[in-house]
A protein has these predicted regions:
Chain B
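C-terminal boundary and immediately downstream tail of ABC-type ATPase nucleotide-binding domains
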Residues: 227-250
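Short, Lys/Arg-enriched, disordered terminal segments
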Residues: 1-4, 250
Length: 225, 250, 292
């Protein structure tokens, strides 16, 4: 009897397990993104500093993060912290730490370039109207920066969602791992399960990420008009 | 004749990092209600001078006095003083993320903490006067250059400044839009607004100015009433400069 | 080389990492203070008993040794043993927390004391013995040779001057090229390519771990594993952190005492036989009492 691959999805609670796995991925990405945005805003402002030493350390941080594979960072924080510092972090906490560490650097660089792309006249008009430095940033520069940042922020978030598939290596079971478990559990009975399971994961990713990028596009359009 | 002196500079000096002297011992005074036009070739220091008056740029030495107060850029009251000295720039410097009304209301509400409904009414009156009452809820990018500059003037006026600094506000405009902006400035002058204007529009300068300052290489070369200056300039440099605006028929 | 890089970068990363997210960095209470050492101190047998549960690292996608069934429950040969450990330690087979590990990080899980025992199809090698302590084996693997029923290879001498398919980098490749130069080898990068080649008749037989070919032959009619065990015998054993002697000795005692009831034969019947069928001899895989 021919066993159809798609049946595997409806065995037991496989389908639900996939959604739970996706929820784990999303949760990690969204929490990390939240911290990355907050810290990245500050880091981006620090990056525009004219102090050469400050700029050097910002650059060093950014380049370090870019050179180091996220996997190495995950291992360092998850296993390294336990071995060397006796800090036993859960896989989820370690993942949020690493993704925030990475996201803050990337976000900071985006914020820096957005800040630098705002003409100097915008600052001067603000000062000429009697605003102080904080007021100029709060009412004039940051609102404009956020608008410019929206597309690249969305991009970073989706990259983060995709990168969450690495966290399985520190024991966090997310959607791709659940998929592998389902495929493997039935590898003797349903050899072509992989195609179906990965296909469904693809659609699930799309179903979740598409509204995000759609919302960002709409918001961007609304802000432009 | 007892006219109040409102702004005064003494021996302002400023050099760029490369050593180029951009302001050289400028001593200047402005009376209440007076309109002073500063003209001169590009790079003569006139825009820098204007920005120093508003403390957007520091000076190397010299003092700036607003009424009886000496202005120090490092001092906190600089933010308060800037509200009394409004400024409009050459480039369209409206805030692109805010509607016209919000552009105008931002500083009065956030800086001066005035009631939004009260300032909104004032803003609408002013917009009506400059012929833009139908534009309150649109965004800057939907306006022409001339319309944007009129809004920028309204935005500066909303702070109730005692002096208005206009830095080549028509230099980036298409010729057909220059007039609509300058007309607004002429009206302000008629109403007694104290202004320091940097411009390349000679006809306008002649019409609006109480006094003309001619600057070259960081120095005030010549000073006088518009009639004196435009009809019989005293210095060779001023004559040469004015000749550039003059074309002989063949 | 890689380890040096990791240690060198650790300082920077941790400092910056903690800085970047210090709000969430909560050091768990009760982590005993101790001097810096290359590994975190594993829980002793007493500490595990006091805690009331044991943490065992298993695979979650290596059917039939450790896998998650369609109801989300962990199953398999290793898991079956893990539950028995919990039962004999605490009186209940639910007193075990299974941690899902990956092949590449099994050693790290022990070194960082995130698990007490690894039961993840962990093959005993000399290299690994330097990093972890292995208890007595509970399973053994060798190579198997699968071939078509029409021209079944049941002895290695039949392979002379014939073509044997192997996957690059496996023990099968090493074994046959060193010990049987008379056999022609056809090498592939991927298992799937190798199986396809066998099905197409590009080779006379295919060899890799016997557990792998046995399971494949069950699902593919017309093919049989004619040689179920050949080559060097590898053993599979539980592993604990290096120096965790009490726990190691307890595990050894457990494995010895389970021989009396032939526990691993029972384990085989429950978890492996459904996959391998009843035609093969369990003695080729199962080890009782640590006696290979």
């Amino acid at each position: 009897m021919q066993n159809l691959g798609i049946q595997i999805l409806f065995q037991g609670n496989n389908f639900l397990r996939l959604w739970v796995g996706l929820w784990v991925s999303l949760k990690l990405a969204v929490i990390s993104m939240f911290f990355s945005i907050c810290l990245g805003m500050l880091f981006g402002m620090v990056m525009t500093s004219t102090n050469k030493l400050v700029r050097f350390f910002c650059r060093l941080y950014l380049e370090t993060v870019r050179i180091m594979p996220q996997l190495v960072l995950l291992f360092l924080v998850y296993f390294g912290a336990a071995k060397h510092l006796n800090v036993n972090l859960s896989g989820g906490t370690a993942a949020v730490l690493v993704f925030t560490f990475w996201g803050t650097a990337e976000m900071g660089d985006l914020v820096r370039s957005a800040l630098e792309s705002i003409p100097v006249h915008q600052y001067q008009s603000g000062y000429a109207l009697g605003f102080g430095k904080i007021g100029v940033y709060r009412h004039i520069i940051i609102p404009q920066t956020i608008r410019r940042l929206l597309p690249s922020m969305m991009n970073l978030l989706t990259r983060m969602v995709k990168t969450t598939s690495l966290v399985v290596l520190i024991g966090v079971i997310e959607v791709v791992k659940v998929g592998k478990q389902i495929i493997d559990a039935s590898r003797y009975t349903v050899p072509d399960a992989a195609l179906w399971v990965y296909g469904v994961i693809f659609i699930m990713y799309f179903a979740v990420c598409y509204p995000f990028s759609r919302a960002a596009a709409l918001l961007d359009k609304k802000l432009r008009d | 004749m007892n006219v109040e002196e409102i702004l005064k500079t003494e021996q302002l000096n400023k050099s760029y990092e490369n050593g180029l002297k951009v302001l050289n011992d400028i001593t200047f005074s402005l009376k209440k209600g007076e309109v002073v036009v500063i003209i001169g070739p590009s790079g003569c220091g006139k825009s820098t001078f204007l920005r120093c008056l508003n403390m957007l740029e520091p000076v190397d030495s010299g003092t700036i006095r607003f009424k009886d107060r000496v202005i120090d850029r490092a001092n906190k009251d600089v933010y308060e003083l800037r509200q009394k000295i409004g400024m409009v720039f050459q480039s369209y410097d409206l805030f692109p993320h805010l509607t016209i009304l919000d552009n105008i209301l931002l500083a009065p509400v956030k800086v001066q903490k005035r009631e939004r409904s009260e300032v909104a009414k004032e803003a609408e009156d002013l917009l009506k006067r400059v012929g833009l009452s139908d534009k309150t809820n649109v965004y800057p990018r939907q306006l022409s250059g001339g319309q944007k500059q009129r809004v920028a003037i309204v935005r500066a006026l909303m702070m109730h400044p005692e002096i208005l600094l206009l830095d080549e506000i028509t230099a980036a405009l298409d010729p057909e839009m220059v007039r609509e902006v300058l007309q607004v400035v002429l009206e302000l002058a008629r109403e007694g607004m104290t202004m320091v204007i940097v411009t390349h529009e000679m006809e306008f300068a002649r019409a609006v100015a109480d006094r003309v300052l001619f600057m070259d290489q960081g120095v005030v070369v010549e000073e006088g009433s518009p009639e004196e200056f435009f009809n019989s300039p005293q210095t060779e440099r001023a004559k040469q400069f004015l000749n550039m605006f003059h074309y002989e028929a063949r | 080389m890689k380890k040096g890089l990791l240690s060198a970068l650790l300082g920077i990363t941790m400092a910056a990492g903690l800085l970047a997210g210090c709000s969430q960095a909560k050091a768990p209470a009760g982590a005993p203070a101790q001097e810096a050492s290359p590994s975190a101190k594993a829980r002793s047998l007493d500490e595990i008993k006091k805690a009331g549960t044991i943490r065992i690292g298993v695979f979650s996608d290596k059917n039939p040794f450790g896998y998650v069934d369609s109801n989300g429950k962990i199953q398999g040969y290793d898991v079956y043993f893990g539950k028995r450990i919990a039962k004999d330690l605490f009186g209940s087979e639910d007193k075990v927390e299974f941690v899902y590990v990956e092949a590449a990080s099994r050693v790290e899980y022990l070194k960082s004391a995130k698990v007490d025992v690894i039961l993840a199809n962990f093959t005993v090698t000399n290299e690994r013995k330097e990093q972890v302590d292995f208890a007595l084996p509970y399973m053994k693997v060798a190579l198997g040779v699968v071939s078509p029923d029409k021209a079944l290879i049941s002895d290695v001498s039949q392979l002379k001057d014939k073509t044997l398919i192997v996957v690059k980098g496996t023990t099968a490749e090493t074994y046959f090229s060193q010990n049987h130069p008379e056999i022609k080898l056809l090498k592939f990068d991927e298992y799937q390519e190798a199986y396809d080649a066998l099905a197409d008749g590009r080779g006379d037989a295919f060899s890799t771990d016997n557990t792998e070919v046995l399971a494949w032959a069950i699902q593919n009619k017309g093919f049989t594993v004619g040689i179920e065990s050949i080559g060097n015998l590898d053993t599979i054993a539980p592993a604990v952190q290096k120096g965790n002697t009490e726990l190691l000795e307890w595990l050894n005692g457990e494995i010895k005492s389970l021989a009396g009831e032939q526990f691993f034969h029972q384990d085989y019947k429950e978890t492996l036989e459904p996959v391998y069928g009843d035609e093969i001899d369990p003695e080729n895989l199962v080890v009782e009492g640590g006696q290979v």
